[in-house]
């Protein structure tokens, strides 16, 4: 038992190399103990050894016929690999063995969402929360899914019913005249009233998302590109065609105004993703940002013209708008990459020698995001529960960095939901973030 606990500890610490050695040693000594095969599957999955991991989970269920946890773990891995039908079968096996297994319902929910079956996915998330009310991951997944789909069958779930009420909220603003501060205040107060009235124990939601998106049915697969950069310090080929129009709101009120604009803004290319965020990356300057993702420098220049005309009219004549290329981290590693003040043909080009790194990583990474079976929906317009919870995190941020405009939005600080993770993350860089805001 001590050796097995040490194995768990090594895995939790991220010491996968030694965890793998210990797991293989334990299996050599105890080949018929199912839980060791199951744990070896988790380790191999963390090491991107997906086929080995599948064999481990299968061996665990072969040894122990009614091993719900191993079936669930196999389902999670198959989902990540884009093998959705097989994943569904494994989750069903786990649920048949253990009907009150919340994690399996959550996993099945994830799988159904990937297949575009949102109503069924939400039903599974709701079941997971019925079984385990403090299941944070299931709460987050359910709330996120409501950004894309309005459930009609799960009205007994307080998250669903609250989201439906928020979606019916009529906001009186348009993009032809200035959005007044009072309209932002009214929007938040009405949304907050719905939130506090309809969700019991709302202080226990623990929702840590900090970005708001409006997008069509496109996934930029940024996680893949960042993984390539983190592992090889090279930029993915896709990112050489990625340009962003960046907007820098001066305070929390202007950030919310920008979000309201993005919610209604229709650009010529429906695939342009729009995002509002608070800056939380260490050593990255700025406080509040809006981004519109474009697919060429020419398109970014055209979008900048559109945004300048609208935002100087509805938010501020002095709002800052500029064009950036790719992720900030890429430009720090390769300064020429972020240069955009020249003709597109003169910009930094992709180094074809880097392609070997991409192919190597693509062989290791799960295929879920590139599966042809995966269905991607665009976000709903109007206000969602996800939106208002993210804005609560924005207000925490504003308060901590000294942006006193947040006091216009809330009558008192008790109207802002607490977030222990936000508090922790901010404590690690508070002086830095205060400095960035005060120098803006």
Residue ranges of model-derived segments:
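Charge-rich, low-complexity segments
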Residues: 107, 114, 134-259, 270, ...
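Helix N-cap motif at beta-to-alpha junctions
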Residues: 251-252, 294-301
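Conserved alpha-helical positions within TPR/SEL1-like repeat arrays
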Residues: 5-12, 35-46, 69-80, 103-113, ...
């Amino acid at each position: 038992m001590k050796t097995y606990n040490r194995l768990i500890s090594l895995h939790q610490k991220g010491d996968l190399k030694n965890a793998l050695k210990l797991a293989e040693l334990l299996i050599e000594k105890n080949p018929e103990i199912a839980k060791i095969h199951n744990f070896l599957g988790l380790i191999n999955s963390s090491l991107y050894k997906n086929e080995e991991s599948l064999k481990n989970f299968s061996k665990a269920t072969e040894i122990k016929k009614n091993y719900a946890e191993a079936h669930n773990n196999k389902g999670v891995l198959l989902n990540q690999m884009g093998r959705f039908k097989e994943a569904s079968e494994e989750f069903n096996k786990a649920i048949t063995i253990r009907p009150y297994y919340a994690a399996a319902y959550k996993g099945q929910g994830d799988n159904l969402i990937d297949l575009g079956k949102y109503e069924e996915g939400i039903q599974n998330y709701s079941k997971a929360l019925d079984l385990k009310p403090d299941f944070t991951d299931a709460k987050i997944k359910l709330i996120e899914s409501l950004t894309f789909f309005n459930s009609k069958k799960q009205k007994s779930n307080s998250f669903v019913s609250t989201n439906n009420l928020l979606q019916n909220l009529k906001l009186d603003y348009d993009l032809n005249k200035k959005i007044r501060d009072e309209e932002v205040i009214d929007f938040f107060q009405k949304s907050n009233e719905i939130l506090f009235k309809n969700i019991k124990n709302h202080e226990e939601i623990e929702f840590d998302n900090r970005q708001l998106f409006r997008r069509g049915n496109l996934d930029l697969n940024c996680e893949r590109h960042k993984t390539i950069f983190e592992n090889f310090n090279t930029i993915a080929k896709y990112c050489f065609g990625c340009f962003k129009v960046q907007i820098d709101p001066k305070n929390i009120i202007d950030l919310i105004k920008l979000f309201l604009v993005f919610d209604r803004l229709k650009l010529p290319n429906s695939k342009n993703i729009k995002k509002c965020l608070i800056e939380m990356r260490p050593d990255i300057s700025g406080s509040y940002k809006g981004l519109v993702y474009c697919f060429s420098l020419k398109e970014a220049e055209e979008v900048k013209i559109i945004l300048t005309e609208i935002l100087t009219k509805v938010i501020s004549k002095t709002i800052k708008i500029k064009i950036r290329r790719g992720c900030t981290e890429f430009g720090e590693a390769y300064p020429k990459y972020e240069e955009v003040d020249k003709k597109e043909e003169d910009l930094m080009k992709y180094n074809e020698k880097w392609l070997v790194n991409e192919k190597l990583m693509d062989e290791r990474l799960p295929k879920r995001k590139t599966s042809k079976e995966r269905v991607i929906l665009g976000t709903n317009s109007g206000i969602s529960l996800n939106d208002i919870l993210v804005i609560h995190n924005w207000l925490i941020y504003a308060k901590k960095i000294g942006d006193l405009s947040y006091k216009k939005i809330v009558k008192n600080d008790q109207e802002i939901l607490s977030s222990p993770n936000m508090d922790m993350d901010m404590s690690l860089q508070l002086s830095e973030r205060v400095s960035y805001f005060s120098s803006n």
